[in-house]
Every structure is written in structure tokens, then in C-alpha cells.
């Protein structure tokens, strides 16, 4: 099949791009699960935008740069911060409902690392509200086709025309993707003028993550195999406060907005401890808080610390955090009376596929958006609630850029269909599940919040064995979702380890005990 715009992924980045691009051509969205099964849907806290005085663009820029620990791209920071208000208006026009005060002004939260209240939100379910509005708008649009349960396997380039390509090949171009239709078990060749990869993050390379089970790094892995450049993959952000409930996957997030509301981190003996680590205490940047919790837990041999909001007005707590209140109540915790057991969990990939200010990768006609991309906004550590606004700003940038090129961009002919010769259906499902767990174990044990040269070396050695075994199976097997996800998880884990070994310092989310000074 042919489509003007092939969008892979259905979170805020992919859907907002689709709504903009549909004015200039036909858009096909492929997503491996249901349309709302994405990281956006799990984002609780909110979305950043300078809205009222005394906040200013300069303050938001400063907070982002400080949190990014010297690794941000100032041009990307400036772009996102200054374009944010305009894109917030677009989200509202598509039907997003942000909370307001009784006098009709937007109710703004403050989270870790922010100097002002600038986070628009919908209760404690902001991502779900944005996703709802976008999904409804997309489903009504006559120029957008949505294909659920379609898994993009690989991107099409000159490699599929028989050419030898590397990351340095001039004119390397993307022509579309091979997509696995889970309903027919067929692999479809989808040709496009432009391909937009917006598949979200890779939290499931770790045992404990706030990400949904679909977050297996598919887009980053596909782009890497297609020879796109990736960067900053070592900067995996761990959210400091996921609900400690070992039986549940994914980890339920306790939003950072709760600490902005006044919640206090405590040890199991009731002692406050963040004042030992940062002047902003419980409102310190995420990497600082996550490492502090990790150190205190390790020192005491404990699995969690507490988050205490019992000193705040109960009615106010329930109205600000209704989802968290109901969730905790369902497991016997009344957050207006009881402390909440919390533990860090893998949350966000600050790196990804390198893109320019138009969202274009190092491969022509290939764009990466949202958590799949590395725009340079986040540097070594993402500022809370900067991700959703980055997604919609860069989606708009990419939509504008592709619209300017569409009239002189044609489909590539001569791409062969998928070759099934010599392959068979696998009956090794149990082995695939076990291999996924091995990847998660390697990453959690050796490439977590605190790392070392030895742990990274050991992780690479163990992952290499899994890589060889999985490639051998892949080459003789008809693709299925589980095998492709495992292959992608291994590819992304490799990038995290490799780039972690290359950086000879501790900075932001990457803390190596062999380079302790930050």
C-alpha cells in the first residue's frame, strides 16, 4: 500500500502530527496495540507552558538547562519553550480540558526542578485527557486511516534495493516500512513519501518501569537498524516515586505534582532525608531524588521509602489527586491518613534518535518524534512535564517541514515484498519470555540508577550472548510480535550500555561510581 504520511505510533506526538499533516495528504497511522495504548496515556503530572506572570520564557529556559546538566541543546530548549503556548492552544482546540480555578484561570502546578507554577493539568490524568482528545479528533478525520494491531518491523531504505549502506552513506533515504499485520499474520510493504516514527520509550528493558508493556523501544531500534544516528541513550530517567506494589506491572506512578503540592519523602523510620542531598529537598530534580532514595534504600537494605501527604487538607488531596487516591485505596492505603510506599522505576529515555529542529533524522524523509527522538531538549536529565510539550511542538515542526516538501517527493518503486523463504513459525514462546526477563534482569542489575565500568562491561558481555541467540532464531523464524519486541529490546539495551561506556563522567541520569564527581 501507499500513503503520503506513514505514522508509526499513536501517542501525543504521532497523533498531533497526523492531525496537522492530514491537511496536506493522506495519513496512515499504524500502532501495535490499541490506539490509546501508549506512554502518553500514563502521563499523570501535566504539560509545561509559561502561562501567567511572574513566570517567563527565560525562567523556563533556565530551569530546563539547569536540569539538563549542561547537555541540553540551547536551540531546542528555546524552540520548545517559546512555541509552547501556541501548541497548548492547539490541544485545547482539539478538545483537551485543562483544570481551571473558580475565577476561570488555568490551575498551574509546580514540580521538581521548576522555579514557578507552570504545569497545566487535568486532575492527575493529564496524559490520558490529551490522548482522549487526540484520539477522538483523529477518528473523526476523513484523511486519516488508523491500523491497530499492526507492528512495524523494519524501515525501508536503499538497503532493500540491494545497496550497501552505513551511517555515513550520503543520501540515505527512508521509503516506508515493513509492517506485521497481527490479524492476518502477513507482513505488508507500506510505501510512504514521509515516515514518522513516534513509538514512545523503552522502559520495559528494565524490570521495574512506569511504562506500559508496549514500551519496548521499537522505534529507536528500527531507526538504529536503518542506520540512523542515536545519542544520549545512557540517560535513562528513573522516576523517584512509583507505588511500591511488587505484584503489579507496570509500576503505578505517584506524580511529581504531589511533591509540588507539599508531600514529603521519609525513611521507613519517619525521618526526612532529602535535605542531606539538595537545597530543594523533595522538590529536587528527578535524578537527584532517585539516587537519594536508591542510596537510602541500599544503605538500610529496604525496598521502599515513604511519601507523606497526610499533613495536607484531605479534601484538597482527594480533589487534586483523585486517581492516585482511588488506586492507593484499592490496596488499603488512604493517602490522607497513611504514608505511601514508593520506589524508583525506569520512566523516560532522555536520548533517542537524533533529530534536527524539524524532527528529521540523519536519514532523509524519516522523522522521529516524542520519546523516540533526541531533540536535545532534555540533555542529561528531563525536567518534569517537559516531554508532552516537546512531543507536540516537534510534531508541528515536522508537519510544517513535510508539507513544504510533499509536492516534490515521490514514492520509491522496486521495493521487494518480505521474503519468508527458509523460515517457519516458532514454538519457542517460553524461551522468548525468558529472554525478555533476562534483558530486564541485566539492565536492572548492571545498568540502573547507579552504574560502574565493571557493571557496564558485564552487562554488555551478557547481552551479547542474548543478541546472538535471538538473531539466530530471528533468521529462521517467521516474525511475530514477541520475537520482534525482544529483538528491539536487545538493540536498545545495547545502545544504553554502549553509550554509557563511552561517557567518562557522571552527569544527570548517568551516574558511574568510577567517575563520582558531578
Spans of features found by a protein language model:
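An anion/pyrophosphate-binding glycine-rich loop and adjacent beta-alpha core
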Residues: 35, 222, 228-335, 340, ...
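Core beta-strand elements of the Rossmann-like FAD/NAD(P) dinucleotide-binding domain
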Residues: 1-3, 185-194, 362-363
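Conserved redox-cofactor binding core of oxidoreductases
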Residues: 93-186, 191, 198, 242-245
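FAD-site-proximal beta/loop scaffold in flavoenzymes
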Residues: 154-166, 171-184, 333-377
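Short beta-strand to alpha-helix junction loop
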Residues: 72-85, 118-136, 147, 209-217, ...
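N-terminal Rossmann-like FAD-binding beta1-loop-alpha1 element of flavoenzymes
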Residues: 5-29
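Conserved N-terminal glycine-rich FAD pyrophosphate-binding loop of Rossmann-like flavoproteins
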Residues: 33-65, 69, 237, 248, ...
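Glycine- and aromatic-enriched mobile tails/lids
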Residues: 1-3, 12, 20, 34-36, ...
Amino acid at each position: 500500500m501507499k500513503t503520503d504520511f506513514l505514522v508509526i505510533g499513536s501517542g501525543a506526538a504521532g497523533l498531533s502530527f497526523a492531525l496537522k499533516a492530514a491537511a496536506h495528504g493522506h495519513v496512515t497511522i499504524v500502532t501495535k496495540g490499541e490506539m490509546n495504548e501508549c506512554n502518553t496515556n500514563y502521563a499523570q503530572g501535566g504539560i509545561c507552558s509559561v502561562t501567567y506572570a511572574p513566570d517567563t520564557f527565560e525562567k523556563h529556559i533556565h530551569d530546563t538547562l539547569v536540569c539538563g546538566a549542561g547537555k541540553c541543546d540551547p536551540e531546542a530548549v528555546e524552540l520548545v519553550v517559546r512555541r509552547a503556548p501556541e501548541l497548548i492552544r492547539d490541544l485545547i482546540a482539539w478538545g483537551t480540558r485543562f483544570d481551571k480555578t473558580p475565577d476561570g484561570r488555568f490551575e498551574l502546578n509546580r514540580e521538581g526542578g521548576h522555579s514557578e507554577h507552570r504545569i497545566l493539568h487535568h486532575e492527575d490524568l493529564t496524559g490520558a485527557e490529551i490522548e482522549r482528545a487526540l484520539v477522538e479528533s483523529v477518528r473523526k478525520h476523513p484523511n486519516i486511516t488508523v491500523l491497530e494491531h499492526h507492528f512495524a518491523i523494519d524501515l525501508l531504505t536503499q538497503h532493500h534495493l540491494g545497496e550497501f549502506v552505513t551511517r555515513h552513506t550520503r543520501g540515505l533515504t527512508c521509503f516506508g516500512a515493513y509492517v506485521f499485520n497481527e490479524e492476518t499474520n502477513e507482513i505488508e510493504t507500506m510505501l510512504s513519501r514521509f515516515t514518522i516514527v513516534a513509538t514512545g520509550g523503552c522502559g520495559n528493558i528494565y524490570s521495574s518501569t512506569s511504562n506500559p508493556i508496549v514500551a519496548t523501544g521499537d522505534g529507536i531500534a528500527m531507526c538504529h537498524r536503518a542506520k540512523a544516528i542515536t545519542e544520549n541513550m545512557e540517560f535513562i530517567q528513573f522516576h523517584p516515586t512509583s507505588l511500591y506494589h511488587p505484584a503489579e506491572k507496570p509500576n503505578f506512578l505517584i506524580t511529581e505534582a504531589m511533591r509540588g503540592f507539599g508531600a514529603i519523602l521519609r525513611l521507613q523510620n519517619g525521618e526526612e532525608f532529602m535535605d542531606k542531598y539538595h537545597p530543594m529537598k523533595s522538590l529536587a530534580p528527578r535524578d537527584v531524588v532517585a539516587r537519594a532514595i536508591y542510596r537510602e534504600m541500599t544503605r538500610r537494605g529496604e525496598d521502599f521509602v515513604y511519601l507523606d501527604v497526610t499533613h495536607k487538607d484531605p479534601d484538597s488531596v482527594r480533589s487534586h489527586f483523585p486517581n492516585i487516591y482511588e488506586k492507593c485505596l484499592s490496596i488499603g492505603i488512604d493517602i490522607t491518613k497513611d504514608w505511601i510506599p514508593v520506589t524508583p522505576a525506569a520512566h523516560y529515555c532522555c536520548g533517542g534518535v537524533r533529530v534536527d529542529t524539524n524532527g528529521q533524522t540523519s536519514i532523509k524523509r524519516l522523522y522521529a518524534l516524542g520519546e523516540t527522538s533526541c531533540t536535545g531538549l532534555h540533555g542529561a536529565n528531563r525536567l518534569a512535564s517537559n516531554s508532552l510539550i516537546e512531543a507536540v511542538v516537534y510534531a508541528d515542526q515536522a508537519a510544517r517541514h513535510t508539507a513544504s516538501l510533499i509536492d516534490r517527493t515521490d514514492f520509491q518503486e522496486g521495493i521487494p515484498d518480505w521474503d519468508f523463504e527458509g523460515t517457519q513459525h516458532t514454538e519457542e514462546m517460553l524461551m522468548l519470555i525468558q529472554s525478555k526477563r533476562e534483558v530486564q534482569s541485566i539492565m536492572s542489575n548492571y545498568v540502573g540508577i547507579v552504574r560502574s565500568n565493571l557493571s557496564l562491561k558485564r552487562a554488555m558481555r551478557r547481552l551479547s550472548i542474548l543478541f546472538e541467540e535471538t538473531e539466530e532464531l530471528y533468521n529462521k523464524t517467521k516474525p511475530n510480535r514477541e520475537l520482534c519486541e525482544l529483538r528491539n529490546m536487545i538493540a536498545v539495551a545495547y545502545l544504553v550500555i554502549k553509550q554509557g561506556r563511552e561517557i567518562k563522567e557522571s552527569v544527570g541520569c548517568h551516574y558511574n561510581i568510577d567517575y563520582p564527581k558531578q
